[in-house]
């Protein structure tokens, strides 16, 4: 069976379209779309279960927290969703906190791929799973080799200096 992804976020968002649709299709995968126009975590989890989705694409805490709450609620009702086919949660666009990641990982045995990017390409990634989730690493990304930070006057910012600058990325 080809990989199956579900972009939970709007397709007008780069995360939804690029990560949720274009990349899975370019890899020969299947894309499942939600039927509703608003975010309903229980409806989303039902769709994941029915379609045997392997990867879900979200936008940080605003999706992860309600999903974790719905997963916990279903478990408390003794009617847990079957998430056994899920392998990855892919997120970009807003903060994806360690607490939200941990909450999801209590219910999903997945890899969480949290990326920082733009139209020009990926600038950094953070990868977590049940064995590696670490409170101190949320919001810290492994930068891509071509990513740099420069001050307004064009000076390169030394990584870890705390100095604020503009993120620049070379190539995709």
Model-found features: residue ranges?
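Conserved AMP-binding/adenylation subdomain of ANL enzymes
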Residues: 1-7, 12-57, 69-70, 74
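Active-site lining segments that contact anionic ligands and/or coordinate catalytic metals
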Residues: 2, 86, 144, 164-165
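Extended hydrophobic secondary-structure segments that form protein cores and membrane-embedded regions
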Residues: 4-7, 87-91, 167
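Gly/Ser/Thr-rich phosphate-binding loop
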Residues: 26-29, 54-55, 68-136, 141-142, ...
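Alpha-helix capping/helix-boundary segments
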Residues: 62-63, 96
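Glycine-centered loop/turn positions within well-structured domains
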Residues: 65, 121, 165
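AMP-binding/adenylate-forming core of the ANL superfamily
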Residues: 160-172
């Amino acid at each position: 069976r080809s990989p199956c992804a579900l972009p939970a976020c709007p397709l007008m968002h780069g995360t939804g379209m690029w990560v949720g649709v274009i990349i899975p299709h370019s890899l020969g995968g299947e894309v499942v779309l939600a039927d509703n126009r608003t975010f309903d975590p229980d409806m989303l989890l039902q769709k994941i279960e029915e379609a045997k989705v392997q990867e879900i694409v979200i936008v940080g805490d605003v999706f992860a927290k309600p999903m974790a709450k719905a997963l916990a609620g279903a478990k408390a009702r003794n009617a847990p969703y079957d998430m056994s086919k899920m392998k990855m949660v892919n997120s970009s666009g807003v903060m994806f906190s360690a607490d939200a990641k941990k909450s999801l990982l209590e219910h999903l045995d997945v890899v969480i791929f949290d990326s920082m990017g733009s139209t020009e390409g990926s600038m950094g990634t953070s990868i977590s799973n049940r064995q590696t989730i670490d409170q101190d690493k949320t919001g810290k990304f492994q930068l891509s080799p071509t990513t740099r930070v420069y001050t307004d006057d064009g000076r390169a910012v030394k990584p870890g200096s705390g100095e604020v600058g503009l993120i620049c990325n070379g190539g995709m």
